[in-house]
């Protein structure tokens, strides 16, 4: 079974468990996004670059309030695709501090309406999904409880 077939199987399991997120992990350059794109192509799933979620309407919201409105605004955008399975690429776009988005909460809320699949741009440490700022300080730490983790082998 190749990596795309393996991922398809994991996503199909996630679809059966409504309210699930599939996180694809792997080293930088391991092909996380490539596998997601290929799976999206095979199954005709909706592939969304997270940069497309950052609309002028979102940016017009006062920075401190963006985290409150992001889940509903993003769900509305994703609903316009009329798809059950959503591939979110470039997740790190949502980590920008001025957006004030709690990515963990966002993915959990979106997963109530869609099966969310995304590549994790960071690493796993002590069982948590972690992402560091460019200066090397830890920026995000998320418990993967309730998420399906699938690792790309390089």
Predicted feature residues:
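Short glycine-rich substrate-engagement loop in P-loop NTPases that contacts/grips substrate
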Residues: 52-78
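P-loop (Walker A) phosphate-binding loop of NTP-binding proteins
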Residues: 27
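Conserved P-loop NTPase "ATPase switch" module shared by AAA+ and STAND
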Residues: 81-99
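Conserved glycine(s) of the Walker
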Residues: 31
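Hydrophobic positions on the alpha1 helix immediately C-terminal to the Walker A/P-loop
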Residues: 35, 39
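N-terminal pre-Walker A segment at the start of P-loop NTPase domains
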Residues: 1-17
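Hydrophobic anchor at the beta1->P-loop junction of P-loop NTPases
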Residues: 24
């Amino acid at each position: 079974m190749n990596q795309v077939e393996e991922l398809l199987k994991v996503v199909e399991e996630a679809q059966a468990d409504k309210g699930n997120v599939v996180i694809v992990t792997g080293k930088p350059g391991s092909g996380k996004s490539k596998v997601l794109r290929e799976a999206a192509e095979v199954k005709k799933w909706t592939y969304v670059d997270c940069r497309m979620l950052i609309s002028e309407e979102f940016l017009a919201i006062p920075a401190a309030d963006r985290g409150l409105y992001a889940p509903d605004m993003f769900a509305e955008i994703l609903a316009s695709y009329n798809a059950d399975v959503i591939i979110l690429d470039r997740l790190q776009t949502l980590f920008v501090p001025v957006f004030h988005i709690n990515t963990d909460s966002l993915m959990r809320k979106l997963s109530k309406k869609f099966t969310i699949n995304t590549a994790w741009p960071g690493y796993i440490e002590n069982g948590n999904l972690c992402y560091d700022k460019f200066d090397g300080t830890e920026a995000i730490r998320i418990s993967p409880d309730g998420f399906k983790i699938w690792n790309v082998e390089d």
